[in-house]
Regions:
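Conserved mixed alpha/beta catalytic, RNA-binding, or beta-rich assembly cores of soluble enzyme
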Residues: 164-169, 195-198
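Terminal peptide-recognition signature
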Residues: 23, 37, 89, 119, ...
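Short active-site loop/helix that positions an aromatic residue
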Residues: 39, 171, 175-180
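Basic, glycine-enriched DNA-binding surface that flanks or lies within the catalytic cores of DNA
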Residues: 9, 65-156
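Short active-site oxyanion
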Residues: 158-162, 221-222
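TOPRIM fold recognition
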Residues: 178-278
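Non-catalytic accessory segments of DNA primases and related replication-initiation nucleases
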Residues: 1-90
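Short secondary-structure junctions
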Residues: 1-5, 97, 249-251
Length: 278
């Protein structure tokens, strides 16, 4: 076009001058050969680099994406003793034998700062992965930071039966009732679901139960002791719908009161019997 301006045969509106180029019909331009090859020739970045380099570039294999690391459970500092927690649980009707068992097997401890009851859940390798916190004053309920609900509080047994509860306190309440009956309260597995939720589906199995069954393939029978309310009844329907083809399932809600702890407190005289007893 002139002594310092050039154009190409393919694109007469593309002008090149002093190391820069501009494609007027496309309203685009650039300063480098890489820009030109990508924007004008339609090369990929790697193709353009190979042309500039004059030889194929070595191909690299992307490093495999690792699975997200397991959540790290943040445990609070333990108190020097568990006197407050013991007193609180006894006030809920739970027998001292059951409380001591949990303390001695690191299933339960008292936090130093708030003197709360901390119920721990472990994975199959014995690593704590879940922590349920219950305030000993007031109605506080919560979970430790980093808790994984797949590994909620449980007391493993030696039989082929697991008893399922909504909370750790319900599980300990059931163990106490079994103790009162003179039974071996830790022969069967006891599992807390760490709460349940409302769902419209009829085959939803809580993750804590799914994980526990996967880790304990010997289990053949489920006995459900969920609450006497709409949420508890709905959770039972979900479990039955999702597992009835693989397990023998018994629905055994509390005989009186809203939950198993209510049933225990009524049994030991800490609470009056509710009108909706069943």
């Amino acid at each position: 076009v002139s002594s310092d301006t050039y154009c190409t045969k393919e694109h007469d509106s593309l002008k090149i001058s002093n190391g820069k180029w501009h494609w007027f019909s496309r309203q685009t331009g650039g300063k480098t050969a890489l820009d030109y090859l990508v924007k004008v020739k339609g090369c990929s970045f790697m193709e353009a680099m190979e042309i500039i380099h004059g030889a194929p570039l070595p191909r690299t294999i992307p490093a495999p994406v690792s699975r997200a690391e397991s959540k790290r459970l943040l445990l609070p500092e333990r108190n020097g003793n568990a006197d407050t927690v013991i007193r609180y649980l006894k006030g809920r009707g739970i027998h001292d034998v059951i409380i001591r068992y949990c303390l001695e097997n690191n299933l339960l401890f008292e936090s130093r700062k708030y003197h709360s009851a901390v119920f721990l859940g472990y994975d199959k390798d014995g690593v704590p992965r879940y922590g349920n916190v219950r305030g000993t004053v007031g109605d506080y309920k919560g979970e430790l930071s980093g808790s994984d609900k797949h590994y909620s509080f449980s007391i493993p047994g030696s039989s082929q039966t697991v008893h399922v509860f909504e909370s750790a306190i319900d599980a300990l309440s059931y163990a106490t009732l079994e103790l009162f009956e003179g039974k071996n309260w830790h022969e069967d597995h006891l599992l807390s679901l760490a709460g349940v939720f409302v769902t419209k589906r009829e085959d939803v199995v809580p993750v804590a139960l799914s994980r526990y069954l996967a880790d304990h393939p010997e289990i053949q029978t489920l006995r459900l002791h969920l609450d006497n309310d709409a949420v508890g009844r709905g959770a039972v329907s979900g479990i039955v719908g999702g597992l009835r083809d693989r397990y023998e399932i018994w629905d055994e809600p509390p005989k009186c009161g809203k939950d198993v702890n209510d049933q225990l407190k009524i049994r030991v005289g800490l609470k009056k019997k509710e009108e909706y007893s069943r």
